[in-house]
């Protein structure tokens, strides 16, 4: 069975700076999941790809967005992508996803623990991925002539609904 990502995913990137903690949010992504179902429950997932336009991430502050897009090299790398390689369902109903994240043209293998709930016949996946910007060859952005520095540690949190 093929499921499609709902039109309004919730994707949040959180980090720190020398001035304050920050969040950037996107509600724009595309995705497809191929799996086996029993009733309305997924029993196996054979394929899952989610892509988010890099410039859909917004902080609500234009200057911060511009610095982030420059650091992410969005003029060259248009998307952030997750590509599933293997999925294992745990006895507690969670999943272990093994796959790759591609950010700023750099691809890294990741393992994610994902919580799945069924709401209104939709599979809702919630999880997060913490990483260092420098792992993806991203120089943490600075602002105000280098006086405000972004921390290297960031976290992507997501809620994805497939139907």
State the predicted function of each range.
Residues 1-163:
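Low-complexity, acidic/polar, glycine-enriched regions of mature
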């Amino acid at each position: 069975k093929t499921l499609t990502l709902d039109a309004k995913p919730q994707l949040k990137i959180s980090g720190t700076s020398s001035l304050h903690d920050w969040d950037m949010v996107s509600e724009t992504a595309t995705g497809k999941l191929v799996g086996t179902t029993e009733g309305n429950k997924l029993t196996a997932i054979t394929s899952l790809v989610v892509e988010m336009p890099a410039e859909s991430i917004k902080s609500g502050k234009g200057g911060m967005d511009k610095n982030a897009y420059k650091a992410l090299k969005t003029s060259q790398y248009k998307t952030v992508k997750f590509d599933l390689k293997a999925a294992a369902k745990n006895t507690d109903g969670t999943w272990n996803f093994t796959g790759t994240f591609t950010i700023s043209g750099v691809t890294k293998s990741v393992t994610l623990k994902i919580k799945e709930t069924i709401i209104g016949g939709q599979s809702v996946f919630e999880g997060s991925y913490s990483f260092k910007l420098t792992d993806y060859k991203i120089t943490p952005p600075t602002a105000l002539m280098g006086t405000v520095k972004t921390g290297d540690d960031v976290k992507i949190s997501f809620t994805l609904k497939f139907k």
